[in-house]
Amino acid sequence: MTKNEYRLLTSRAVNKIGNVIYDYGNSSWIAGLGVVGQKYLGYYQLVDSLIALFLNPIGGAIADRYKRRQILLWTDAIGAIACGLLTFMPSKQGMLFGLITVNAILAISHAFSGTSFRAYVVTLVKEERLVDFNAHLEIISQIISISSPLLAFWVVDRLGLRPALLLDSISFALSFVCLWSITTKETHLQPKSGQIDIRHLLTDIKEGLDFIHREKEIFFLLTIATLVNFFIAAFNYLLPFSNQLFNRSSSYATMLSLGAVGAILGALFANKYFKNNYQSLLIALGISDLGLAMLTPLHLAKVSTLVLASGNLWFECFLTIFNIHFFSMVQKKVPKALLGRVFSSIFTLAVLLMPLATILMTALPMSVNPLSFSLIGFGISLTSLLAYIYARQHFM
């Protein structure tokens, strides 16, 4: 990899560390406030979803109109300053409202930085290296997802919330420094890029939607991602009930741990054994569902918890391969000037369908059942099969 690729990966890694530590430390601190904490933790989590829903489309338009590196620098700087100032909050009540406020600020920042980062990647990474870069990004993300909560627990438990916030501030500052050292010129900017108002933003968003509707391959990829996210949301709703469903106290933790291992394995295999084309993409998606389908018969066979959880390892492994090739294909097929808006559409639709899946799982009386894992797997399998038939007729 080039120096700029290393710097971009390092920036993303330390930025994610800051986000994970902030979310874990603050959620556990708020939850520890008792009845009051339960109410405010709901507010804390609701802020994320609402901001993502309303600001993702705007974030994509901004990412296409301005320099993406500057957007990332601004969001890192805001995160560093906000977390740093929060360490000086004197009272518990002030800290509580401060945490919710800063969480809203970070959620706003993420609405802009998430799409900007995915779109900025193509400025630094050559097309033939996109799959490899996205695989490295996934490996780093999974390692941080496993290790950062442990670090956050140690810091909050031993040192308290304020040192954790200071660590957050430092991580955002380090991410800023890594990005600052990248000087590659961005080529996606158009002559109109200096103008900005609500009308121009709405026009930009419409241009992005028109492009997605006009380009059948991009619309196809977006449809697949939306349907897959629906089933993943249903799976994520069901997963915390693993201990009760499988009558084992360690099922949930083991499923999560092996799922993370599967994601790392998927990132390692993505570029070695799968090509970046529709056939590989949809085969990986179709194979992934076997992991979920295995959970129900493995439970009935009364195998060990480790063997049972290997179904989630399989699922996450091939789902990660699908995700890596999906994002790489979008980055290759979409013009640089429109990447921000296309990615914002992907993220927005994902946010829209996740609550729908959760509502459906909540409303159905028998949804919390071991059989539901297999049904979700069947839904993913059917999606991949229909998508494969369509792609074979039109794109392959």
Give short role names for the model-derived ranges.
Residues L96-A107, D132-L189, A253, S257-L258, ...:
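Hydrophobic alpha-helical transmembrane segments
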Residues I78-L86, L106, S171-S175, I287-L295, ...:
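MFS 12-TM fold signature
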Residues M1-E5, K185-L222:
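Juxtamembrane intracellular "pre-TM" segments in multi-pass secondary transporters
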Residues A13, L161-P163, D204-L265:
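A single, central transmembrane helix in multi-pass transporters
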Residues R7-Y24, Y44-A61, K67-A82, G98-D157, ...:
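Substrate-agnostic recognition of the 12-TM MFS/MFS-like secondary transporter fold
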Residues G25-K39, Y237-S250:
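Short amphipathic helix-loop junctions that connect adjacent transmembrane helices
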Residues F54-N56, R65, R69-I71, T75, ...:
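C-terminal transmembrane bundle of multi-pass solute transporters/carriers
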Residues S27, C83-P90, A152, V156, ...:
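Structural signal for membrane-spanning alpha-helices in multi-pass inner-membrane proteins
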